[in-house]
Structures are given as C-alpha cells and as structure tokens.
Amino acid sequence: MIYIHMRRIHLFRNLTAFLLCLLSLCVRSSAAELKPKTTAAFDRYVVATESRFTNELRPDGPFLYIDALPAEKAKNSYQQLKQGEILVEKLETKVPGAGSDIPDGMVHHWVGLVFIPGVTLANTLPLVQDYNRRAELYTPDVIASRTLEHQGGDYKIFLRLHQKKFTTVVFNTEYAIHWGQVDPARMFSNSISTRIAEVKDADKPEGEENPVGTGHGYLWRLNTYWRFQEKDGGVYLQCEAVSLTRDMPIGLGWLLRPLVTAIPKASLNRALGQTRTVVLRESKHN
C-alpha cells in the first residue's frame, strides 16, 4: 500500500511538472495583445463588482465578506480566522446584460481574510500605507516600490512585481489608491492599476519594457480592495483582488486553466500571511 501511495505521488508530481512545462511553452511561444473589447469587458466586470461596495461600506453594512454569509458559516469562519487560518475564496460577479466570460482574456477574482491578534489599527495602518517599503515587506513578489504622489487619503505608487511559477516574469506597475473610513474601527482602501508593462528580460528587471498591453499577457490589470476592522482583540484584514490576464490557447483551456487560476490565489494567500507577520513583528518593536 505504501508503495502504491508513493508511486501515485511520483506520478502526480511528474504530471504537474509536465503541465507546467506545457503551459510555459504554450504561453511563451505566442505574444498576446490587449484588445479594446477585452478591456471594455473587464471594465464592465469591475463596475459591477464595485457596485456592491456602497452597501458594504454603510455603517450597518456587511463590511467583511464573511459578514454576509449565513450565520453559522460566518461564525465558523470567524473561528477559523481566530485560530490562525487564512481564508481565501473564489468570487464571480454577475454582469447585468452580459456573461462573465471576457473575450480573449481571463478574470481572476478572489477574496482573502486574515486575523492579526493583539494589534490595533494604529499598529497596522502605518505599515500598510508605507508604500516605499513594499519591496522590503512583500519579497519576493515585489522587488521595487516607491510612492509617486501623496495627498491626504490618495496615493499614486509604483511597484515592480516579480512572478515565478511556470516561468519568470517582471512587471512595472502603477496604481491609484484611495483610502476611506467607515468609522474609527473600520478603514478601507481601493487600489486600481493605472499602468502595467512587462519587462522584456526578467533577468534584467530594470531593463527595457514591452509596450503597455503587449508581451505575453501574464498580467494586464490588477485591482485590490482592502478592508481593515479592529475588533475581537485584533485586526481583521481582507483583500479582494480582481486581475486580468490573457486567455489560454484554444483547445488547452480545460487542461491549463486550473494551473493559471491557482497563481493569483497563492499570491493573495502569501500577501495576507506576509502582512500578518510584518504587523506582528513591527508591533513588538514599538
């Protein structure tokens, strides 16, 4: 039985390696161009997604994703978070008058939550708003970061992103970020990508870029919506991420799509875990 089990593990690993290799060859061998119809469909998806925020950000609204769940499921989710788990769920927004498919593109929509015990918003917010330190705090996914502009609750920032899964790729990205407050215990921020360009040679991250909207299509858009709530002796942190990438090659979507969709989920999980680690570490020093 042990032999059979180990053989299955070996076969699974070989199959996974083969699929990753196939995915790398398929995507690297063909360039992808962001088309107006793809952008328009993604923009409609974002508008439909953001339309529910008005209700969620009301003083009596379901501020966190789990607040809108049935009572028993919400209770269990809070318990899991207090026990140290990171919760990540796949979401899908229904776009009025249109399907959820994006022509020549894929939307990746996830929400994740983590609980940071023993801290306050006063401990947490200065760290997450220190965009100049993103490369230090979120390594290896962020390799350079700086604040471009800052006025009140509005920021413009630059992040150089490093992604390594089936291949290595580097992006120069810029975001417009707006911070708001529901009440003294609840804060939120919306981060909207305004520019994403793939670096031509990932081994030279400060090198020449591909024109915006060209390259391999690994990342065309990235919006993140953050919520912070102080209660239960700590801070609940939620991040909802909506990103746009190229679609899979015709005929291989059923095989490769699960591998591609796993990347943003893993990135979100890692970012939440890193944020918790950093906030806990820094709060002990203050």
Where are these regions (language model features)?
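Eukaryotic helix-grip
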Residues: A32-N286
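Short, charged low-complexity linear motifs
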Residues: S24-L34
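N-terminal secretory signal peptides that target proteins for export/translocation
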Residues: M1-F12
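Bacterial N-terminal signal peptides
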Residues: N14-C26
